[in-house]
Amino acid sequence: TFVGPPPRALSLHSATLPAEVSAGDLLRARVVLEPAIAREAATRRDEADIRELHLLVDGGRRAQRFAECEQADSAFHNAIARMTRSPAIAGTMAWLSSARRHAAWQRDWERSYRGLAPATFQTSHSDQHQRIVEVIAAGDGDAAFDAMQLHLEDIAAAFLPARACNQPGGINR
């Protein structure tokens, strides 16, 4: 039996923690978790899942504004998590995505990534999303892991200043 509240640093209260998560923390979590999620999705996908992912990639290519890019990206990554057929995985991904709606994420994004979207999202990121769909559709879990990792590392490199990647909370392991 535990007496008292858990240490603040370990709190997972869904209403407060996303607001406390920095862009570096969020990207690090995504780089660690999402490749494994993509691998699992490749083993559990069905034709309806693949059709949904193709539609989401097409929607991303048509995104014209920042908000549309963010919505398309979030929908794509959350769809992959749902493909695992695990409510725990899908819920974790939805929770991570919710951090992107908070002020800290928006400020970090504004400082470092704004110049790239939506043009980069329509091209490079959508091409990466398409590659992820192809390998998931093929049922190649290892290739799905690699494609997702490459995609997220590319985002992190564009999103975070190089100095932030090498500091605590940055994405480098």
Regions found by a protein language model. Give the residues of each.
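Residues at secondary-structure transition points
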Residues: 17-24, 28, 67, 71, ...
